[in-house]
From Swiss-Prot:
It is found in: Membrane. GO terms for cellular component: external side of plasma membrane; lysosome; MHC class II protein complex; plasma membrane. GO terms for biological process: adaptive immune response; antigen processing and presentation; antigen processing and presentation of exogenous peptide antigen via MHC class II; antigen processing and presentation of peptide antigen; positive regulation of T cell differentiation. The gene is H2-Aa. The keyword Transmembrane applies. Residues 183-195 are annotated as: Connecting peptide. This is H-2 class II histocompatibility antigen, A-S alpha chain. The chain crosses the membrane at residues 196-221. The keyword Glycoprotein applies. Glycans are attached at residue 122.
Length: 233
């Protein structure tokens, strides 16, 4: 199929339901970013940014009705397919910081997990091999064009050269959990020999500058002297 070119793309009313576990979601997206979703437990609309909810509104009952329809349809399709399960795909994860890393300055780590199918996954943050729950937020499942899903998990943190981080991904398509490692890249300190060489080069450049400057001054004085002509007595 030919791709359709557009300046902006809105995906409205994406409904997902699967069993077992009564897992479902209803989302709205714009240009690949989540706008809002309906929380099944709280039965309310959750906006990605609170400011969005001040501009417009969405009745969560509409999303809950769509999910109920998805649940009913899934039961019919399961019987027709003789309960044949979907193929599990292996997701792919990448970890990167939101902003350039400066030690001691607050930042956010992002774990981007793509090619998720079916949309059931556990994403866990580890700091120095220990689970971290404070400062963690993740999006709902966002739809890809090939009908797989992606999800982002965020961790607010303060970079330190003593800490290392891992994003742990667990999914039915993986034989074992996948750990994506991240740690701040700290420039290695210069050795004494390197510092000595740098200082020597700096001193040499300075001396050359002094010599060249002195030569130019002398030449300038000589040129000024030869250009003078004695006046009449």
């Amino acid at each position: 199929e030919d791709d359709i070119e557009a300046d902006h793309v809105g995906v409205y009313g994406t409904t997902v339901y699967q069993s077992p576990g009564d897992i479902g979601q209803y989302t709205h997206e714009f240009d690949g970013d989540e706008w809002f979703y309906v929380d099944l437990d709280k039965k309310e609309t959750i906006w990605m940014l609170p400011e969005f909810g001040q501009l417009t509104s969405f009745d969560p009952q509409g999303g809950l009705q769509n999910i109920a329809t998805g649940k009913y349809t899934l039961g019919i399709l399961t019987k027709r397919s003789n309960s044949t399960p979907a193929t599990n795909e292996a997701p792919q994860a990448t970890v990167f910081p939101k902003s350039p890393v400066l030690l001691g300055q607050p930042n956010t780590l992002i774990c981007f997990v793509d090619n998720i199918f079916p949309p059931v996954i556990n994403i866990t943050w580890l700091r120095n091999s220990k689970s971290v729950t404070d400062g963690v937020y993740e999006t709902s499942f966002l739809v890809n064009r090939d009908h797989s899903f992606h999800k982002l998990s965020y961790l607010t943190f303060i970079p330190s050269d003593d800490d290392i981080y891992d994003c742990k991904v667990e999914h039915w398509g993986l034989e074992e959990p996948v750990l994506k490692h991240w740690e701040p890249e700290i420039p290695a300190p210069m050795s004494e020999l390197t510092e000595t060489v740098v200082c020597a080069l700096g001193l040499s450049v300075g001396l050359v500058g002094i010599v060249v400057g002195t030569i130019f001054i002398i030449q300038g004085l000589r040129s000024g002297g030869t250009s003078r002509h004695p006046g009449p007595l």
